A protein has these predicted regions:
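Short, charge/polar-rich alpha-helical segments
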Residues: 1-13
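Short, charge-rich amphipathic interface segments used for partner binding and complex assembly
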Residues: 33-65
Length: 68
């Protein structure tokens, strides 16, 4: 789970990089099956990271300090 704003920013940057990779695959992979196989891992990781971001943003900063 994301613990602070620095980790949040890092995760958001990582999501953007993974999205760019999927966009690149869409352009270069001509076989739809190969595209889906190649992109699925990136998309699953994007989903996981977005869930982490959502969980972090749901919490108020004081909630995070209680867990320390």
């Amino acid at each position: 789970m994301i613990q602070n704003d620095i980790e949040l920013q890092t995760t958001l940057e990582r999501i953007a990089k993974f999205q760019q990779q999927v966009l690149h695959l869409r352009k270069v992979e001509v076989n739809p099956t190969n595209y889906r196989l190649s992109a699925s891992g990136f998309l699953a990781e994007i989903d996981r990271m977005q869930l982490d971001v959502r969980e972090y943003l749901t919490l108020h900063p004081s909630d995070l300090k209680k867990g320390e």
